[in-house]
Amino acid sequence: MQPSMSFLIGFGTLVLVLSARTFDLQGLSCNTDSTPGLIDLEIRRLCHTPTENVISCEVSYLNHTTISLPAVHTSCLKYHCKTYWGFFGSYSADRIINRYTGTVKGCLNNSAPEDPFECNWFYCCSAITTEICRCSITNVTVAVQTFPPFMYCSFADCSTVSQQELESGKAMLSDGSTLTYTPYILQSEVVNKTLNGTILCNSSSKIVSFDEFRRSYSLTNGSYQSSSINVTCANYTSSCRPRLKRRRRDTQQIEYLVHKLRPTLKDAWEDCEILQSLLLGVFGTGIASASQFLRSWLNHPDIIGYIVNGVGVVWQCHRVNVTFMAWNESTYYPPVDYNGRKYFLNDEGRLQTNTPEARPGLKRVMWFGRYFLGTVGSGVKPRRIRYNKTSHDYHLEEFEASLNMTPQTSIASGHETDPINHAYGTQADLLPYTRSSNITSTDTGSGWVHIGLPSFAFLNPLGWLRDLLAWAAWLGGVLYLISLCVSLPASFARRRRLGRWQE
């Protein structure tokens, strides 16, 4: 009996609904080992109006081209291991991985011991050092472009490759690895055009903006010159109107609320230079999430990056379907599953292999397309939450009255009833991260690197007592075996000489 059409349609709809519920969460998979894109954010174009203050300028610039170039990538690492053997049998080890920047022939694959013995008056320690060097040589393909950064690599950051290194055929990357390739000479064609630009008249210096380049340039005596573009504007002062004087305002009734200050500072909010300073100050120092600002500013949802002096350092990502896992560890970011592997989803929606620590019991509200609430170390997956989508009316008294629905309970006494928080200390719940003292390594993305803190595992009095008793038992057993070996031949000879004892 064949199934009916309505059954098939219903079954297909159910499968689609279940799949949508399963993959309702998405994360960004990003390759930050690749070369980032450097984009001038042009925050000065924030108040740019294409139809006002238009002037004609003569522009001469270099045409941009991109080619692929085969290369050989060489990466060498030196593995350093130093083992300390204590007098009582305990030991400790320091493991360090360093980048080797010498020649491949100089990267020896044999061990090199040093400091065979160290001893002083209170303990005796044997330190043995072993160093092994390994190199990986890979054939790769890179992209060379006529504008900086001149080289793009998907396996490493090639932003530091200069034009001279392109012509020499060898370059050292920022991570210490090297690239060898056929020497290449950059060549660009000069393009001359007459373009319409917009003069920003509310700036202290004359700035012309071109929509064709999405860039603005500061004019000095009507011209701008650089290695890649030359701009000459003849009538750059004729289209600007004189500035209006700001009116004196009554500042005696100003209060600290933002809605009271906003009308007073209306002229300041409209000033592009002040907005530029605010944006660069907030997002250029790492205080706020620069990736969220870059996505809104560049109108691209699948990028991450940071801002350095008005220039966005951006990586392209792609969205993948992930699912929450049980939050059973002391991690600040929630664990997620992607293709059977465990990752951590940070606040910017990016998948990471590492995460900061957090105290157990910390509740976190997160935004991943929807609001989610999860508790660190609870063993429960984060769940979606909803909120009342109404805004308050900007009056402090009514704002407090509308939200006065939480019982007034002492935070310290309330948290002391939680045994986990009490074990960590009642003051620790004020910090999102735990004060960890056992982390002596840092993940840099290319490998596990030890930062060189010494190890004192041999300073263990209980271990000394245990080893001393073990040595005493071992010595007693040896002495018993020696006495037994000495007495057995004598007893055999005595029995042979006297015979067996009889009544």
Curated annotation (Swiss-Prot):
Segments on the Cytoplasmic face: 489-503
Record InterPro entries: BDV_G
Domain of life the protein comes from: Viruses
The keyword Electron transport belongs to this UniProt entry's keyword annotation: no
Transmembrane spans: 468-488
Gene Ontology CC: one annotated term: membrane
GO biological process: clathrin-dependent endocytosis of virus by host cell; fusion of virus membrane with host endosome membrane
Extracellular topological domain residue ranges: 23-467
Post-translational modification as stated in the protein's UniProt record: Glycosated; Stabilizes it.
Presence of the UniProt keyword Signal in the record: yes
Site (Cleavage): 249-250
Residues bearing carbohydrate: 63, 109, 139, 192, 196, 202, 221, 230, 235, 321, 328, 388, 438
Signal peptide, first to last residue: 1-22
UniProt keywords, alphabetically: Clathrin-mediated endocytosis of virus by host, Cleavage on pair of basic residues, Fusion of virus membrane with host endosomal membrane, Fusion of virus membrane with host membrane, Glycoprotein, Host cell membrane, Host endoplasmic reticulum, Host membrane, Host-virus interaction, Membrane, Signal, Transmembrane, Transmembrane helix, Viral envelope protein, Viral penetration into host cytoplasm, Virion, Virus endocytosis by host, Virus entry into host cell
Purpose: Unprocessed envelope protein p57 is thought to be involved in attachment of the virus to its cell surface receptor. This attachment induces virion internalization predominantly through clathrin-dependent endocytosis. Envelope protein p27 and p29 presumably linked by disulfide bond are the viral type II fusion protein, involved in pH-dependent fusion within early endosomes after internalization of the virion by endocytosis.
Protein name per UniProt: Envelope glycoprotein p57
Organism, scientific name: Borna disease virus (strain V) (BDV)
